[in-house]
């Protein structure tokens, strides 16, 4: 029996040992598998966005005396050392045809033109009948002038008309007769038969369709470079691929704060003073197969175009009423000559050849034909632009009148409608003073006449082309100059940029967990409070309201931001009174956006308990359903952008869990701080605490009585099972003896029993003492046994661990010695082989050397044999 008990005890010891080891391994594995959400602030993550851009411009780039229509004096100064950071191993998608920067620049230019013309004079009183005749001046050309000047004089005749009309003076009921010179394109006949050549009655061309506003006297239309900049929290991504076609992925990406200087040149057909391609000519279109889409051509070498208005004009003032002055052309000094532009024929032909080469690559090696515009408004049919304040409309037929094809031997075959004459292409130009404003329908502008001669020089850096439709089987593709939509002009410069919003907050799994006060209670009512307004919790209790502080703080911030937006809208609505330009509004918006982005990020960090931290651990366990990748795959093989796309659908959920965890932590800390009342012993004797003392005493007494009853019942049940019948709690209960302990006799024989009969204790204090003693002894024995088992396990694990370490140390020493011996042996063998090889090489060299030395001797011996 004893042997059996000993065997059972031994088996139990093995079971305890293996069970404890398995439990430890399970705990280690479970601890290793636990991952926790960690917050990172400042991660390089961005997302496509649209935001308000503000402008920067060089303060010295414009004349301080004249007000340029672009209002660059309201822009911030440019950064003398702009920073551009190249993003290594980054591929980003760009789309120049769906770029909000283009729309924003278009709206800005419209607003600038509107604001520039708002205070200027309306020319409604000029919508009267004009009696006009062709303007002729005395021809003072002498015989020494060049023949080409005479030709231009003949072309210039009939371009201007001398008109007289009645106008109201400062006194309303008084009319006076005035005269003025108008360009032929600015007036139209009002006779019934407009095709006759002897019409004398005319009117301004836009009187029946548009409201004409005269440009203010000191407004300059000279384009000034404008840099578009992003506010803090946003950035510009720039594509640096030299052959980027405007859409698709770009592998050479950098980030900048501002664009390069973009000149807002309003022109058609030809793009002037823009940026050039770095290598070969680049063509861009939203869809090359759709002939309705404009093709933007970017040249790699600019072509200079020089334009002139030879006439020496004077300016005349006509008073239209109180405070309203109309400026018109007074007279022309000298000969009337037509305005014109000159382009080098060789440069232009070389440019067309490069464009044709690029177009042939795109459209299947067909013949590339350039033809004149197919018709439309004068702005579309002719190359229109501003030169020195005057608006030129130049006939570009001579530029687009050729067909280009490659012959079988690889040379270019060029067919022209007109033969080339001279080294210079001269484009005849006409000037208009009443301009259809390209940005607004139903409004026109009267450009003031410019005194003196006008000359301007520009660089052609691109073209706007349209392709004629037709079948796929045709052998010739016809391209015509286009334009008119100024968005294409801005798009030709903004194609390489896109606006992104920086997302500095990132979450990722790590093994680090925030140490928190452990109290597994959830914040009751938190989810319901999410739907309450900022003031919706005013009627709730203070406890319920305190659970929704996060929601209220968020709504408070959004209220501040909304208020700022309302103020901005009010300022924008009253900018004509405040004299704010569109750039001033944008700067205010940019500053508000920067503050808003910063406050939002700091607000989230504050909600999560991460204020002022770049890396912040949390108590939120990582859910494998968000991403089941391992830590090595995440941290060693993925960028922050890839990781953000991986968990983008769960980011809001993770943020919510972090907020709930932080709220629970703060509630637990609050309850823990309430326990500090026990540190104040002076309040223990307070009369208000007596009821608590009595309640605690009653609970202790009740617990002891209940415990005593339980023990008594268990004792009775145990003795009943052994055959005793307890008649009373005062019955003496004999303690059983063992089989080897005989009872005593009357003669005193035998051993005196040390264990006599005992009776149940009686009395309240005796019962309490006996029960407490039994409970303490039981707890002591169990704890002692547990500590012995733990100590034995620790001792065993320590001994086994030490043996394993010694084994690995001996194994390491053994293999180190083996590697050392192998290395020494390898070095010895190598040295022997090298020595033997060296000896052989030396021996061969010596033999060759001796052979060379013996050559004279062998020759002498040969001669001796020959003589013998």
Swiss-Prot record:
Topology Cytoplasmic: residue spans: 718-868
One GO BP annotation of this record: fusion of virus membrane with host endosome membrane
Record motif YXXL motif, residues: 724-727
Region (V3): 307-340
GO cellular component labels: host cell endosome membrane; host cell plasma membrane; membrane; viral envelope; virion membrane
Positions occupied by motif Di-leucine internalization motif: 867-868
Basic and acidic residues compositional bias, start-end: 738-755
Note: Inhibitors targeting HIV-1 viral envelope proteins are used as antiretroviral drugs. Attachment of virions to the cell surface via non-specific interactions and CD4 binding can be blocked by inhibitors that include cyanovirin-N, cyclotriazadisulfonamide analogs, PRO 2000, TNX 355 and PRO 542. In addition, BMS 806 can block CD4-induced conformational changes. Env interactions with the coreceptor molecules can be targeted by CCR5 antagonists including SCH-D, maraviroc (UK 427857) and aplaviroc (GW 873140), and the CXCR4 antagonist AMD 070.
Official protein name in the record: Envelope glycoprotein gp160
Organism: Human immunodeficiency virus type 1 group M subtype B (isolate CDC-451) (HIV-1)
Lineage of producing organism: Viruses, Riboviria, Pararnavirae, Artverviricota, Revtraviricetes
